[in-house]
Amino acid sequence: LVVCRGYRVQHNDASGPYTGGLRYHAAVDLAEIRALASLMTWKSALVNVPFGGAKGGITIDPDTMTEKDLQALTRMFVRRTHHLLGSYRDISAPDVNTNAQTMAWFMDAYSDIHGYSPAVVTGKPVSLGGASGREQATGWGVVDVLVSYYEHHRIDLVDKRVVIQGFGNVGVWAAEKLSRLGAVVVAVSDVYGGIHHGDGLNVKELARDVAQGASVTEAESGEL
């Protein structure tokens, strides 16, 4: 039997419904979730979208759990918090160690209680009404900001050497776009370690291997 502590912090809804991700990580605590919820408020306001800020999390190491366990955990979290949630009240999204599948479980559990409610989460599978390109959006957005900065300062991105810390959903797609735009990704790291190759890593092969469950140190040869 495992007892997990879960959180959903709603910071501000002056501009619209609360929205923010749901993360699964062993280091999750209330202070972190409160801080991230407030940041969601400011992010929504900064880009002038009609949402407020919230954040959720469960203190658990997902690597120690089966897919069946994670589904049960997600559904239990929804059952315990459903009265706080809703398409026009509080909308969840993928975050650290959660993904489109997590959002599908979340939506299904909420719909079991309140009726069909696809808008209670974003980042769900396209087949369930999710937005095409959602998986890539954050990583590509990071690169778009960098490109705008370089253009403003009249710097050429081509052949610039890039190091990326973190090779999850954000880092993978940031590396992909940077490589496509002509930058050279020479090093990446994840929670298990890092890898370096002076002439540049094969981002496409590295991303493929990581998607199949490898760490970056297992997926590509280079200087560790």
Positions of PLM-derived features:
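N-terminal ligand-binding/catalytic initiation module
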Residues: 1-132
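Glycine-rich phosphate/diphosphate-binding loop of Rossmann-like nucleotide-binding domains
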Residues: 122, 130-224
